[in-house]
Amino acid sequence: VNGSTCGIQAAIMSVCNPKDKIIVNRDCHQSVINTLILGDIEPAYIYPQIDNKTNILMGIKIEDAIDTIDKNLDAKAILLTYPTYYGKVYDLKTICNYAHSKGMIVIVDEAHGAHLGLSDKLPMTALEQGADIVVQSTHKTLPSFTQSSMVHIQGERVNQERLTSILRMIESSSPSYMLMSSLELAVDIYETKGKDLMDELLDNIDIFKKNMEKYKNINIVQADVHIEEE
């Protein structure tokens, strides 16, 4: 109930000790940077692609991620933002597999992707692609109250007891029961009505795009915007 900021803090500090190294995308959320400062953890950055026409950050290149991993084999983990704040996704599965082959834990800030599992028309979720720890802002794209988020863990690489212990240290000892209840309600809506609601939303988005075509001064940026090499 301290937002995804709390989840990010717990995820990073559960796998990294002071002076350890972690690989992160440079366009990460401020909570990542703040956690590295608080935990005295060294970052190795992967810089994102930038669309030259819109200046929109378009996510990282797989080649850059692999190259950064190879140059920082002493890193304990890699943290990636997926999807980006602009909705851009990339081949996370390849990065997860490669990071795992080098003994690294994969943390994903999926703050804007809690809805991805609701339709086959949407990109694969971070968990489906092999991430070990995924932090989601349930309040952003699912119907829980603002500040309520979730941390998901899968596999045997993560020390769940350590993560839980750190959560207890940094999370409020007086959590709002309204926020916690809203998370339970969001899960119920997700499971019982989520797919139908998402289908309706995707149809409405298509209608909106078609309606915008008549406005010459408005351009809709597509997910596959071409990025010119400098």
Question: Positions of the model-derived regions?
Answer:
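Feature for intrinsically disordered/low-complexity regulatory segments and propeptides
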Residues: V221-E229
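Conserved PLP-enzyme active-site core in the AAT-like
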Residues: N2-Q222
